Amino acid sequence: MRIKVLSGGRKSIELPLSDAELNFQMKRIGIEEIVPVCRLVEASEKDNPLCKFEGQTVKMDEVNFFAKRLDCFTEYERKVLYSYVTDYGVGTMQDLINLTFSMKGLSLITDFSDVEQVGKRLYLDEFIAIPEEEKQQTNFIKFAEKTFKESRVEVLPYGVFVEHGFEMQEVYNGKTFPEYFASDEIVAAIEVQNQAGDTEYLSLIHI
């Protein structure tokens, strides 16, 4: 994703970046702090949840971590994420990051032509996977009817948003990013903790 940030001068940055690359880009616009802070001017994609934070001051390490998470999402997952942010809102970058770890039980239905497929979509979003034996035994039409009846349903301009079994997880506490690795180059991780109990994860990368 491409974003524009402001700190003395406006600059476009392509995310996600490695920690070293992010620090380099921040120094190019005069930011030397360990935790770089900028004003988010613009997120290029119109359906990017970061649009909700345009005009606000953000921690760039949080924005970069979110970009890493979003980079691994499918197109469908991105649409569900954007729908939740648009319809319900998120107050902080911490909330947005935690939402990326809490997608279970959120669905966006845009095609009702095949009710059985709708049921399968809802089932997958709630239970993550469908074992073959369970797939043969489940009546997905009835499951869809039950889910729509018992869940929070919102009709949006681009589809029907369904909240069923969703629970926001606090994976990121605002200080230590969760143990999450998207790169195939990482071969091991070390967890370190200081006397105050704060945890950091150090990655060992194969070169």
Predicted regions and their residues:
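Short coil/turn segments at secondary-structure boundaries
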Residues: R39, Y82-S83, G159
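Acidic, proline/glycine-rich low-complexity IDRs
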Residues: G119-D198
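Charged, alpha-helical interface segments at or near domain boundaries
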Residues: K46-S151
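Conserved small/polar residues in nucleotide/adenosyl-binding loops
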Residues: I205-I207
